[in-house]
């Protein structure tokens, strides 16, 4: 019988995010201040974003640690199954192995909570410090 789904055990879930910028030859240009057309500073961005989110956005480090609290929330619905698309492979008559992530198993049925959870975490962390 062919294996259709691969489910990563909880013990093997990532504890760090991979930052693709670290491997880019041509790194993205910094965001510009619309008034001055100059690169924005962390201080200017602090009016819109939590400090840790800004640091990550501007980081060139290859890996960024995922806070344990975020990892615990991820474990509620992850890991999402990696599914082999045998039917598509056959229809395309390709020797390639085609896989897709089935994000429908998450509470909202998509990947959006994967970024929403850490954004909310950092916003709550920094706003509760200021309160």
Where are these regions (language model features)?
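Extracytoplasmic/secretory-pathway segments with low complexity and glycosylation-like composition
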Residues: 1-3
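Conserved small/polar residues in nucleotide/adenosyl-binding loops
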Residues: 126-131
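Positively charged, low-complexity intrinsically disordered leader regions
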Residues: 10-23, 27, 35, 48-121
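Glycine-rich phosphate/pyrophosphate-binding loop at beta-loop-alpha junctions
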Residues: 30
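Glycine-rich nucleotide/cofactor/substrate-binding loop typically near the N-terminus or early
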Residues: 33, 37, 41, 45-46
């Amino acid at each position: 019988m062919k294996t259709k789904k691969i489910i990563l055990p909880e013990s093997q879930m990532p504890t760090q995010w991979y930052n693709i910028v670290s491997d880019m030859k041509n790194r993205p240009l910094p965001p510009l201040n619309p008034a001055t057309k100059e690169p924005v500073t962390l201080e200017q961005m602090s009016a819109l974003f939590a400090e840790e989110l800004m640091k990550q956005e501007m980081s060139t480090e290859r890996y960024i640690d995922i806070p344990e609290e975020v990892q615990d929330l991820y474990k509620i619905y992850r890991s999402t199954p990696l599914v082999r698309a045998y039917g598509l492979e056959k229809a395309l008559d390709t020797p390639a192995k085609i896989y897709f992530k089935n994000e429908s198993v998450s509470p909202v049925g998509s990947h959006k909570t994967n970024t929403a959870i850490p954004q909310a975490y950092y916003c709550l962390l920094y706003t509760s410090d200021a309160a």
